[in-house]
Amino acid sequence: IVDAAEHSIDAQYYIWSDDRSGRYLAGRILRAADRGVQVRLLLDDFNAEGIGELFASLDTHPNIHIRIFNPARNRSGWGRWVSFLMDFQRINRRMHNKTFVVDGAAGIVGGRNIGDEYFGFDQSRYFRDRDVLALGPVVEGMADNFQAYWNSRWAYPASDLYASAPADTELAETMEGLRQQAVAQPRLPVSAPTGAEQGRSELAKAFNRMTIAPGELVFDPPPENMDAPSETPKRSALALQRLAQTATREILIESAYLILAREQLQALGATERPQLEVAALTNSLASNDLVTNHAGYARWRPYMLEQGIDIYELKPD
């Protein structure tokens, strides 16, 4: 999808790691910018501390513009954690969106961040997240989501946050290294396109396999006030509630962290709608990367079963 881009790439991520897959994708984006594609990258600050050199270098390219969402006032070492403790209410509000939009015509949205553990390159862990590749009117919603966060008062130009641009020699080495890594193809499961023409050809093949159906994107806009919790229910929560209340045959849930309140479980429960089947797939204790989140789910597991919800837990292998 990067190689197929002709005009623009807008990418928004919670995590973009400075590892093999992160640098590979950064290199592909850099090569797109080299041929004139306008690139905007919006990254959450919480995981951006260790990748300053990579993105400070990319930000020097005339066709690449990078913003950081909700940055800490003190951005290095212990100072970052001091900021977290002193300004917890604001710093705890993170941007978990993962959106990738090309030319305003095709987009990818889902749960996958950019890092080796999300693409099967990490030997110790593998996060099996899902993405959806879409085109058509629903991509307008993806673009609107990106634009809302990009123009948010909480999105700061990366150039305002990094102390200085890399030295010329260091910058040249980093940029050339990224261009070379983009060609190297780090043990990919399939061969990647080698240019824009082949990229568009591969994308056309993917489009021929797509499911044609009505689609709607629901996203929560960036908050106006970071310092106080909102009393207004989020768009996504309301949309899920409407779907659950109107379901007549089946509800399928897949979530890494399945933590629901009692009233949400009652709304999902099939005991009052015998014809409704509800099934949920989540992590087991062995496959979960956050024990605290599993504990929050496990305490409600007996009640979920009482409500007629079938639960499936992912094995660690």
Task: Tell where the protein language model's regions lie, with residue ranges.
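Charged, low-complexity intrinsically disordered terminal segments
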Residues: 1-98, 102-317
